[in-house]
Amino acid sequence: MPKTIKKQNPSNTTLQYKKYLEQSKEKTAKAKNKDVSIDDLLKKPFLEEIKTNVLKKNKTTRASTATRGTSKVKKQIVESSIDFFDEKKRGVFIVPPAGTSVINDDRDDNKAVEETVSKTAISQNQLAHYANSELVETEQFELKPVALEHNQVLTSTRHSQERESIFEKAQLFWQIFVGDVRFGFWKNHTWIWLGFFDQHQNWYYFEVVETVELPQEHTAFIKRKQIDSCFWKPLVGNPNYGYIQNNIWVWKGFFDTKLNWIPDPVRFTLPMVEKATTTTPVVQIELPAPPTVTVVDQTSPPTAAVTVSTSQPVIEEQTTVFNQTTQLEQLSVSAPLLDQSEVETEMVEVPFVAPSTTTTQPQVVTVQAQPASSSIQFQEPIIKVEFVNESFDFKKPSQTAAAASQAPSQAINIALNEADLIDELVAVGTTATTALPQSELIQEVVVIDNGQPQQAGFHYVVDFLTSTAPLTVAEIELQEQELVNEFVTTTSRETTTFASTPVFEPVVIPTVESEEQLLENEFVESTVVSATSNEPNVASTPVVETVELTETPVSLEPLETVQLETAPVVTETVTVTEKAVEPEVLAVVEEAPLAVEPIVETSTTLAAETVEEAQVEQESTAVAVEPAIETESKATSEAQAELDWEALIGNSEYGYFDAEQNWIWTGYFDEDNKWVSTATAQTEANAEEVVLTADAETSELNTESDPSFEPEVEIQPEPEPNFDLETIPEPESIETTEPEPNFEPEVELEPEIEPNFESETEVQQELAQESSFESEPEPNFETEVEVQPESEIESKFEAEVQSEPKVSLNSDFETKPEAQAEVTPETLEVEATSEAPELQPETEATKVVDDVEEEQLDWELLIGNSNYGHYEPSGEWVWAGYFDDNQIWTPDASVEWARESDYTDLIGDEIYGRYNRKGEWIWYGYYDETGEWVLVDEHYQNHQPRISEAPRFWEQLIGNEDYGYYEDNEWKWYDGEFDSEGNWLVFHSSNAEDAKNIDIAKDIPVFESFDVDSIDADEWLDQFSDSDAKEVFGED
């Protein structure tokens, strides 16, 4: 602890020490001016803002007990997070010394006890009495050592972290109370709180209504129509809205969405803990009557000296426990006052305080304890003090030789929180913790002589403006009206704290890139199933099923004959069981001819897992079968390259557009990208599937083959054409045969009874009567096509039939040739007699394509053809006619008048057209020469055409405030209209209130001398004749 130096040589005094003395003299001179009062000081602008926080603190004094006399206990609640402001507008927090609980936790059962001297106990008269009194010898007193129990010491670092964490949590809850009339009210776009919240989120109402100076600067921004998003920038630096701390602007509140200012109601209250008493005191303390102390104020006249006598009572409810194993020596302390002549040359060493957080050394008193069995008696030392220039200089406490010889000295740390004048007994209980010092100057004299480690305690200075220099207690301006010019010089311990600047680094979210396989020409599924083997071909009997149709028969067209041979890809299995045919089932049935429905023959897919399942031996050759086509695997060239089928959209050979402008394919591409037409007659939805199996035994047609088995077949439905060329396996060979469309075969068939085949799959057949019909089949299934080339087909009817329809096993399309057949149970042989007509198959796909070309024309191919239109100089194509409902071109010169500038605005209007799947705009009609809409598409004949509008000259006036205004980003016209000549006419209101505001005298000067309200218009108009009206208004 730095020692007090008396009469130090001024030449050795540091510059900082001199500056400190000059500041002390200046403040002393200001305080001695009786004309300057605290009310005058509070008239300063910066103090007016904190007037209520400094002077109107809630103070309560508890009544003293009978044994305590004039001792008082203060219980105060600091209502502001700032203890006080200095003359430099800097807010100062006073932090309690170590051992004092920072937060008053209600859950803590142990209450801290504080016994201190009231700052009002030493009045001005007492100080004067002390100044004029002489040194009074201190009386000896005895102490009994007892055990002391101290609370845990809190470090400054822990305290600062706890305070910051409390502040961050405290400002999250109070925003929900904004607008609640129980907590405040609105005034001039500012929320006024009726109280405050402490750090524990407890609400306290103000006991005295505070005269809060409301900030008014932000109200000017609210009255503006268009508010700038950076309106708050001019408010930075305004003390009504915040303060600067460490060169950072800190707001005292926030603005809501309506720009209302809402201040922060959180205040860190530091309550003085209540005194705890014990029902059974451990030690009884008896003290003699205290001596009389006289103090004379040297700054006052001699007549102002007053003698005051005070007595110190015995505190029975307090208990002091000391270590009984240690005996303290008796101590005699004297501190003589300085002479008046030594005032000017007085030099007191003050330790240098760095600009950081400092700690305050609490009072430590060294006393002597004597053993006693029942009680401990304390006797207070009397100190003679001379108050000079607000600074004190004490002699080092002296100890008598007699007291030192009695017992070894022992220092006891009482752990007081303030530097107090020892003018009364301070008794500390077992849970001795002190409360926070108040935000006033301390008026007591301290005698400190202790070699024990100092306890933690510091002043924490918050700089709200620009200065960062720390303050000591001696630099604080007068805070209470009863205070004069005294201040306390105490030892201090420097503690330096550094606040680390947080470094924010951007958080990078790792991204994982995954490759996605691009699928081009994706197929839904592959419907091609084949089973090839090197084993000999298996002969099978055809199974024909008749289906009744309600539609009119349509003639068939010749079909393509395609042969392809694929690799052994087996995805589905068919079990074929060889069974003998029962001859009694094959009876000839002769019935009356009936109307024969078209026979629908469908292709099937025959797949076998193994070659053994597909091999069937013939047990009977007596039954004749329908001519079968030999299917033989042959090597072909390698697979062709992938086909860009999207380029074929629009080609009439591959499909057509329907009424909805959707492209419809008339076939599909096989494994080798060969086009296969599947245009067949569309049947009823309930038409049953027909299984057709054929077996080629030799290269020639066999008419005598015994149906010895009926294989179990599985029919696959035909999906939508979806060409995924990657999923189709490459065939081993392919051979195609072009159909001959010039033949229309007519086959005579006899009714046939279905043979009874014993197998897992039983196919029922219907008898077909002899009839002639035509049908137009539709594709129903997609299966693998495997046919023989035309060059290898030989028929015994070659002389009579020039060509025959070619049927393949596992065909990918349905073969439905127009037939007139005679079927018998015994034989399916085609009769080659003169009665049998020639087989003339038609190419059905070619006919369908022709129909598609008639139904849908690719008019885009006609653009540029001078027979259909011409190009404008601007490069626009203008049609010279239109296509009617039957897609027939109708030349019409009247459509040439339409230009792009006339119908561009109509593109996108569903009344005049639509977009197809390609994104092209399709018109429903056209405008004729008269400008009227002519509807062409009958499907949209119910749509009403748009009425042609006048030139939109008024669009240029949108945005002109003379004609309207914007409301919610929507332009609204004033109450008016344009006449036929384009003049703007405003409608005036006919309300009586508006009529009263009209000054008729301005429009009609004749009425200037008349009372307009009393004039009868009819009576006034009667004085004019018709000729007068014509002269004024004209003949009309």
From Swiss-Prot:
Null mutant phenotype: Has impaired gliding motility, glides at a slower speed and with longer resting periods than wild-type. Binds equally well to erythrocytes and a human lung adenocarcinoma cell line, but colonizes mucin-producing cells less well than wild-type cells.
Gene3D superfamilies hit by this protein: 3.30.70.3600
Main location: other
Annotated region (3 X 6 AA repeats of E-P-E-P-N-F), positions in chain: 718-781
Keyword terms, alphabetized: Cell projection, Repeat
Stored InterPro entries: EAGR_box, EAGR_sf
Localisation per UniProt entry: Cell projection, Attachment organelle
Extent of the Sequence repeats: 718-723, 738-743, 776-781
Domain of life: Bacteria
UniProt key word Repeat: yes
Location of region: Disordered: 697-727, 757-784, 798-845
Sequence ranges of Acidic residues compositional bias: 707-727, 773-784
Gene Ontology CC: one annotated term: attachment organelle
NCBIfam families: EAGR_box (TIGR03834)
Physiological role: Protein cytoskeleton-associated which plays a role in gliding motility and perhaps also in mucociliary clearance.
Name the UniProt record assigns to this protein: Protein P200
Source organism (scientific name): Mycoplasma pneumoniae (strain ATCC 29342 / M129 / Subtype 1)
Annotated gene: p200
